[in-house]
Amino acid sequence: MKSGRFIGVMSGTSLDGVDVVLATIDEHRVAQLASLSWPIPVSLKQAVLDICQGQQLTLSQFGQLDTQLGRLFADAVNALLKEQNLQARDIVAIGCHGQTVWHEPTGVAPHTLQIGDNNQIVARTGITVVGDFRRRDIALGGQGAPLVPAFHHALLAHPTERRMVLNIGGIANLSLLIPGQPVGGYDTGPGNMLMDAWIWRQAGKPYDKDAEWARAGKVILPLLQNMLSDPYFSQPAPKSTGREYFNYGWLERHLRHFPGVDPRDVQATLAELTAVTISEQVLLSGGCERLMVCGGGSRNPLLMARLAVLLLGTEVTTTDAVGISGDDMEALAFAWLAWRTLAGLPGNLPSVTGASQETVLGAIFPANS
């Protein structure tokens, strides 16, 4: 069973940067050593957003984007290696999630697509890469997501305390760590995605820092109820979603019925949408004693305050409080999944994804020995 230093690379639906984490991993523990966030050029970010909202590309344009993202991920890894004074030979493997551009796990031909050519990463770093983590689970009838609950269970489950882990990235997802029950998990709906999209269009800001805009506005209750009527929110688990569904076009369709509203009121309503849809799912899943929050949304004071109010009796905290960086959680999870793949261990949980069986995940892109 291979153990040693692994690197995890994650570029999530928020597109707020490439998260890169260095960790030592073996069968007994995961210890984070270092991390960095690598910027995504505006042109690449916009190209990904365009695909996610259905804009057509030629095969040439798509291939170029795949290559450019692979090079970007390699640059991020090399920056971390340089910062830590490490060589390629010091790393067992890289676990790279890739950039999701489409996720459609139901229908006649279920599929998910993450791009960022792993061959580019191997060639530019000299390190073995494990990637393409989601499609095996989909091939076995699963959603291909979320995959992180298995990692949350390994690190954060408690023998007697009812715990849940909430990741608020572009999409919010919940891991159910309930003693005596199979691990559960699913996407609750939009996390930061709609809030970020709205303030970007209205004020040219990548996100609502400290929820300043949202706190200056008032929740538009009819708009909130209109958005809450979306069938995704009442759909039973297992379920997963992404930017191809909850995007700016989705928001525009709901806003057509509310012309002339104050942009700050819309921001406040979107924050409330995220808080309400999360809290409803926590309660529908039986509630918990402790909700541990990670991801960019854990730094949104309004979201955290609203969750505490909506979930009275639950201790709402961050994963940082238990010693795991909320910013690095997902990248760390894919380093761990790479370790499991190389060890020949399953990485999915059928109780979470709905797959017909446990399976080893991903494809291995070996470096030259």
From Swiss-Prot:
Gene3D superfamilies: 3.30.420.40. Keywords: ATP-binding, Carbohydrate metabolism, Kinase, Nucleotide-binding, Transferase. One of its GO terms (biological process) is peptidoglycan turnover. Its EC number is 2.7.1.170. CDD domains: ASKHA_NBD_ANMK. Pathway: Amino-sugar metabolism; 1,6-anhydro-N-acetylmuramate degradation; Cell wall biogenesis; peptidoglycan recycling. GO terms for molecular function: ATP binding; kinase activity; phosphotransferase activity, alcohol group as acceptor. Signal peptide: none annotated. It catalyses: 1,6-anhydro-N-acetyl-beta-muramate + ATP + H2O = N-acetyl-D-muramate 6-phosphate + ADP + H(+). InterPro entries: Anhydro_N_Ac-Mur_kinase (IPR005338), ATPase_NBD (IPR043129). ATP binds at G12, T13, S14, L15, D16, G17, V18, D19. Catalyzes the specific phosphorylation of 1,6-anhydro-N-acetylmuramic acid (anhMurNAc) with the simultaneous cleavage of the 1,6-anhydro ring, generating MurNAc-6-P. Is required for the utilization of anhMurNAc either imported from the medium or derived from its own cell wall murein, and thus plays a role in cell wall recycling. HAMAP family: AnhMurNAc_kinase. Belongs to the anhydro-N-acetylmuramic acid kinase family. This is Anhydro-N-acetylmuramic acid kinase. It comes from Shigella flexneri serotype 5b (strain 8401). The gene is anmK.
